[in-house]
From Swiss-Prot, chain A:
Keyword Transcription: yes
GO biological process: regulation of transcription by RNA polymerase II
Function: Component of the Mediator complex, a coactivator involved in the regulated transcription of nearly all RNA polymerase II-dependent genes. Mediator functions as a bridge to convey information from gene-specific regulatory proteins to the basal RNA polymerase II transcription machinery. Mediator is recruited to promoters by direct interactions with regulatory proteins and serves as a scaffold for the assembly of a functional preinitiation complex with RNA polymerase II and the general transcription factors.
Main location: nucleus
Localization: Nucleus
GO function term, MF aspect, one: transcription coregulator activity
Span list, region Disordered: 171-206
Subunit structure: Component of the Mediator complex.
Biased composition (Polar residues): 183-195
Originating organism: Kluyveromyces lactis (strain ATCC 8585 / CBS 2359 / DSM 70799 / NBRC 1267 / NRRL Y-1140 / WM37)
Name of this protein: Mediator of RNA polymerase II transcription subunit 19
InterPro entries hit by this protein: Mediator_Med19_fun (IPR013942)
Gene designation per UniProt: ROX3
Swiss-Prot record, chain B:
Keywords: Activator, Nucleus, Transcription, Transcription regulation
Main subcellular location of this protein, as a coarse class: nucleus
InterPro entries xrefs: Med14_N, Mediator_Med14
Cellular compartment(s): Nucleus
Disulfide bridge map: none
GO molecular function annotation: transcription coregulator activity
Annotated protein name in UniProt: Mediator of RNA polymerase II transcription subunit 14
Family statement drawn from the similarity comment of this UniProt entry: Belongs to the Mediator complex subunit 14 family.
GO terms (BP aspect): regulation of transcription by RNA polymerase II
Top-level taxon in the UniProt lineage: Eukaryota
Assembly, per entry: Component of the Mediator complex.
Length: 206, 998
């Protein structure tokens, strides 16, 4: 349409309508919301995977809420996955979403500092936290020494569940499985990958 | 398609291709990444790490000194902290993995895109809001005939996007090719030929047989369905869809694009394309028509004739069935259902009226050609249905056909307006709703119309109408009764009607009375109404409210007056008021009698019964109007409450006669036998004896109030009881005192005064008074009082001492002992000169007396013991006799001689007691005393039953008292004697004589 307009402006006298042709003409928005933006940005595949309904209108497999499969490759033996629902997850957002520079060690780019020096300073800005006087390791060992030896049965009825530590005390754990996932070589892998077509799709995507 | 459009399409297509090419080169502008509220992952990791390091160092600093905590508590604290921190790291670990996956899959772009869309949406919304605001502020600004679409084009393009039809506006030569008309025409002709050949090679279904080839296309016309235009391009190509017109409704919007696609597919793929196309279109059209019928029904049911919920339908688009229900409120029409569906045979839409009752031979139940015609079809069905119901009702004979009604939709029903007249009422069925209604209804009719519509079958309806008629008759009668002065009781309600309603008849009771009627008594009008007739039955009944429930206590079952409704008139109602009163009272009396358990029977004056009634009642009635007289026979025994003994005195039945005109109540009775009572009139009893029949008597009372009639009955009963008691006593008296001296001085209901002594002996008005003490039912006792100067007055003491003597005994005793008491007086009469001998009677008991003679001259006294003893004569007969002896034993001669009255003793001993005289006396026995009985146990019986002697004794006078020993009849027992009561007086006088002679 833009082209025809250009023709028009050339052929018609300016006084033809109460519109000033010299003014900037209307241009449609870019990207145009009328277009299929998913296709334009090449997002068809990912959109298909996360769609709530399948192409045939049936309900698609729900997205996972638990991250059980995501931590299977860790060495721990997680019997219960800590979550908000079972009260063992704890609140993380107020810890990680604080953005207060005053509370943090800052590396400053001092004049005359080379880029390498600055990067080094950036990397080492937090090391102080793990060294005296911030962290007195001797004191730590003293305190740990005071705690004496423990036995799992000790914590019965004290509101603490030893299993939550996820220590693989007897060594069985989920090692056989773990190896299996590792052989897949994918961090996205889930234990029943082969069985669920939904997960199959995801894996193939990568 | 026309030729002049073709260049336009070509131009469009080229522009499309151009834009596509343009797009391929086009690199989409980057979508702005979402940054708001987002932190880099590295910062999150660092935050958590710093936090963890600080937490741990804090813990150790706090727990380096033991403080108050036990090692276990510290351990627990440490473990919990570590657990918490570890879990947070777990989450971050998962987060890192997710972030990696998202990055790999370009998922963040999706999020960015979504965010961008949101922003865009927000902007559009803002624009709309701004526009709205502008609109508000520009309320006064107006544009004549605004062409907004063109305006927008001008705004956007600087000029309107008008079709130029290939002309150049500025007049310069166009580059566009124009096709010569000749070429077009040739092409069309070629196409026509081509199509003709092609169609002749194809199999054409019979429905598509009608076609026409023109303008380069084939036009198939199927009547009432569609007009299909097909064409092709050359001999080898299949047919293509060009256009379709619906012949039944041209205005219907069609999705031509889809139809084109579908038909082209069939034409292209199928080996027998036309057949399939027809089938497809036929089905398509049927479905369309079905839908249109649904729309039509919707309009009809919601806004049309049948609006208001009288017609509903259910359109099943899957099964292609429409179920129609009409007359939803009608109950009597049980199935009001039609079904619209496909007829498999004709493959057309058909409507079937599904009513099992309909006669399919005479009435159409299947309808075709529904489209645009559904209203008239439903009209026809409802009309037919109404006719069916009407025919059903006519068959019951309750209704008449309305001859004036040309549409024959109404029924006539007869309802009485007065007793004699009947009016026709039109009952109609509303064809829209199926509900019955009356033509020109009254309030009563309206309320019944509601009930009629509630009835679910013909029988119910007839029943309701029957009730309507009954109600109407009821109100008519009540009105008449009100006007004639009757009082209709609205309160009285019986649990069940007197005449129970049946299937075909209905009954209702009206309870009426007059002002002065006895309470609880009603005239019960029972209306019995059937479809064609109406009868009114009149009864008399007594209705009482017992514990709030009305109960029928008495009902005259025999005399039911039955009359037809049309014979009821005002004059009759008035006459009834007069004539009914007797009956009410009669029934009331009978009811009361029944309540008292007195046997009763109403006597009628009919000729066959007249012989039962005694003549004295008949005679009176000969002159009087028997209408006002009632005679009721009463059982005496039950009337007097079971005193059977009285039956011997009176006849067992009595007659109660009530004369309503004179207000008289009379009770007639009759004695069985003639007795003394009849001759002694007792005025106070006011019992009158009839002249014609001496044994019959009657009592009479004048009644003022009908309610008190029973009072008179009890009065009568009291009198009757007294009468009977009196009669009984009188009879006894007469039988005991069989002397001339006996005379009743005064007779009162409870008192008899009489004389029985000889005139010279009784100075009083009466010698004895008998008071009859009665209680409610019977005679309790007789009080016998002897008068003051009665010589026998001393007996009173002994009578009073011991109660319970039979009055018969007392009377007999009085009569028997009378000579003893008379002896002293008699002695005075016999001796002319003043007597020297005084006689004194002492009474020891009722059986023993002491008689003392004292001679003043000689100065001696002599006493006798007189005893009353009963002597057994034969086995069944007893006789009481006097035994007389000396009080002292004078048998020793010396004792006798010492006594101053020795001479008298000797004489008495010799003449009265001595057995030595017996022989001599026997030989001297006169012929008159021949009946000397055989001597038993040395005692000789001497008969004294000589009437002459009795008369002599009674007539004994002082002048002819020439009595001597020989005349005295007695049995001598040596020292004592026995004699009968008529001999005792002469004997005692003889003793007196002997003693005074000394």
């Amino acid at each position: 349409m833009a082209t025809s307009h250009e023709d028009g402006s050339a052929t018609h006298p300016n006084y033809y309508y109460y519109v000033d042709p010299s003014l900037p003409v209307y241009e449609s928005q870019q990207p145009n919301p009328v277009d299929d933006l998913i296709t334009i940005y090449g997002l068809e595949e990912v959109a298909r995977q996360v769609a709530r309904t399948n192409a045939d209108g049936t309900k698609a497999v729900k997205l996972r809420k638990s991250y059980k499969n995501q931590i299977q490759d860790l060495s721990g033996r997680f019997i219960t996955i800590p979550s908000r629902e079972n009260g063992k997850g704890g609140e993380i957002s107020d810890v990680i979403f604080q953005n207060n520079p005053d509370m943090m060690n800052q590396a400053k780019l001092v004049e005359g500092m080379s880029e390498e020096e600055y990067r080094d300073a950036m990397m080492k800005r937090d090391t102080g936290l793990f060294e005296p006087p911030q962290m007195d390791w001797d004191m730590c060992s003293t305190v740990i020494g005071q705690l004496m030896k423990s036995h799992p049965s000790e914590f019965k009825n004290s509101g603490f569940d030893v299993d939550d530590l996820a220590f693989d005390l007897n060594g069985t754990g989920t090692k056989t499985k773990k190896r299996k996932y590792k052989s897949n070589g994918s961090s996205m892998a889930s234990p029943n990958t082969e069985l669920q077509p939904d997960d199959m799709k995801r894996r193939r995507l990568e | 398609m026309t030729t002049d459009v073709a260049p336009g399409t070509m131009e469009n297509e080229t522009s499309k291709v151009m834009s596509l090419k343009h797009k391929a080169a086009y690199v989409p502008p980057p979508i702005p990444h979402v940054e708001m509220n987002q932190l880099p992952l590295s910062l999150l990791l660092r935050n958590l790490t710093v936090f963890t390091a600080k937490e741990i160092s804090q813990f150790f600093k706090l727990n380096v000194h033991t403080g108050g905590k036990t090692p276990f508590e510290k351990k627990l604290e440490l473990l919990n902290m570590i657990l918490f921190l570890r879990n947070q790291f777990l989450k971050l670990y998962v987060l890192v993995k997710w972030a990696k996956t998202l990055k790999q899959n370009n998922f963040h772009s999706l999020i960015d895109l979504l965010n961008w869309f949101r922003n865009a949406n927000m902007q559009v919304n803002n624009c709309t809001m701004a526009l709205k605001q502008i609109l508000g502020t520009m309320a006064g600004a107006k544009l004549p005939n605004p062409d907004l679409a063109t305006s927008l084009e001008v705004l956007m393009l600087g000029r309107p996007n008008l079709p130029n039809h290939g002309f150049n506006l500025n007049g310069s030569q166009s580059d566009n090719l124009t096709i010569p008309n000749k070429l077009i025409l040739k092409r069309l002709r070629d196409l026509n030929t081509c199509l003709s050949i092609k169609i002749s090679l194809m199999t054409i279904p019979s429905q598509l047989a009608k076609y026409e080839i023109k303008d380069g296309r084939i036009v198939f016309t199927v009547k009432d369905e569609f007009e299909l235009q097909l064409s092709t391009i050359d001999q080898n190509s299949p047919l293509f869809f060009v256009n379709i017109n619906l012949l039944f409704n041209e205005r219907l919007p069609l999705n031509l694009a889809r139809l084109e696609k579908h038909i082209n597919e069939i034409l292209f793929k199928s080996t027998n394309p036309l057949c399939l196309v027809y089938q497809f279109l036929h089905k398509y059209i049927l479905t369309l028509q079905m839908y249109m019928i649904h729309v039509e029904l919707n309009a009809l049911g919601l806004n049309g004739k049948y609006s208001g919920g009288h017609l509903v339908h259910n359109y099943d688009s899957k099964k292609q069935i429409i179920t129609i229900k009409y007359w939803l409120q009608s109950k009597i029409a049980n199935t009001c259902k039609c079904v619209v569906g496909m007829d498999k045979e004709t493959e057309s839409i058909v409507l079937e009226w599904q009513n099992p009752d309909v006669n399919k031979e005479t009435v159409t139940t299947r309808y075709h050609g529904l489209l645009n015609n559904i209203e008239s079809i439903i009209d026809e069905i409802t009309f037919n249905h109404a006719q069916m119901i009407r025919a059903d009702l006519l068959r019951t004979d309750t209704f008449q056909e309305d001859n004036e009604d040309t549409t024959s939709t109404s029924l006539l029903f007869q309802i009485p307006t007065t007793c004699a007249t009947v009016s026709q009422i039109q009952l109609k069925i509303d064809q829209v709703s199926g509900i019955f209604y009356f033509h020109n209804p009254s309030n009563l009719l309206l309320s019944y119309a509601r009930q009629i519509n509630q009835s679910s079958n013909t029988q119910d309806l007839i029943t309701v109408l029957g009730r309507l008629k009954l109600d109407k008759v009821d109100s008519i009668l009540r009105h008449m009764l009100d006007k004639t002065g009757w009082i209709c009781s609205d309160v009285v309600r019986l649990k069940s009607s007197i005449v129970p309603s049946t299937d075909s008849t209905f009954s209702k009771d009206i309870f009426v009375k007059l002002k002065d009627w006895p309470s609880n008594w009603f005239l019960v009008l029972t209306i019995i109404s059937s479809t064609n007739t109406c009868i009114v039955e009149k009864r008399i009944g007594k209705i009482l409210s017992v514990k709030g429930v009305w109960k029928l206590k008495y009902m005259d079952k025999k005399n039911v007056i039955t009359s037809k409704l049309d014979t009821m008139t005002y004059p009759k109602m008035l006459t009834l008021q007069i004539s009914i009163l007797n009956k009410i009272v009669n029934h009331m009396i009978i009811d009361s009698l029944n309540e008292l358990k007195i046997k009763n029977k109403i006597c009628t004056f009919t000729t066959e019964d007249s012989n039962i009634l005694p003549p004295y009642i008949i005679r009176k009635d000969g002159k009087e109007n028997t209408d006002n007289i009632t005679v009721i026979a009463l059982g005496l025994e039950s009337f007097l409450e079971g005193s059977k003994a009285l039956n011997t005195i009176l006849e067992s039945s009595m007659l109660l006669k009530i004369d309503y005109q004179k207000m008289d109540i009379e009770l007639y009775g009759k004695f069985k036998t003639d007795n003394e009572m009849i001759r002694c009139q007792c005025d106070e009893l006011s019992i009158k004896f009839l002249e014609e029949d001496s044994l019959s008597f009657f009592m009479s009372e004048n009644f003022g109030n009908l309610n008190d009639i029973m009072l008179y009955l009890s009065k009568f009963r009291k009198k009757l009881t007294q009468l009977i008691a009196l009669t009984d006593v009188m009879d006894t008296l007469h039988s005991n005192f069989q002397s001339m001296d006996f005379r009743v001085v005064e007779l009162r209901p409870n008192e008899i005064r009489f004389k029985y002594l000889p005139m010279k002996d009784s100075p009083d008005n009466e010698d004895c008074v008998i008071r009859i003490v009665t209680n409610q039912e019977k005679v309790e006792k007789l009080d016998i009082k002897l008068s003051e100067h009665n010589p026998q007055a001393m007996i009173q003491r002994f009578l009073d001492e011991k109660e319970g003597f039979a009055h018969n005994f007392i009377f007999h005793y009085l009569q028997f002992t009378l000579p003893l008491f008379r002896a002293s007086k008699e002695a005075d009469y016999t001796s002319s000169s003043p007597s020297t001998v005084k006689m004194h009677l002492f009474m020891h008991s009722l059986q023993e007396f002491h008689f003392l003679y004292r001679n003043h001259k000689v100065g001696g006294e002599l006493s006798f013991i007189i005893q009353l003893r009963s002597v057994v004569r034969t086995r069944h007969q007893e006789n009481t006799q006097y035994f007389v002896r000396f009080a002292q034993d004078y048998s020793q001669p010396q004792l006798q001689q010492q006594h101053p009255l020795s001479k008298a003793i000797a004489e008495i001993q010799k003449n009265a007691f001595s057995l030595a005289l017996l022989k001599e006396q026997n030989s001297n026995t006169t012929s008159s005393t021949t009946t000397a009985g055989t001597a038993t146990a040395g005692a000789t019986m001497i008969s004294t039953a000589s009437s002459n002697k009795l008369l002599d004794l009674q007539d004994s006078s002082p002048t002819n008292a020439a009595v001597d020993w020989s005349s005295i009849k007695c049995v001598r027992l040596g020292s004592a004697l026995a004699c009968s009561h008529d001999q005792i007086l002469p004997l005692l006088l003889q003793f007196h004589k002997s003693i005074s002679d000394c």
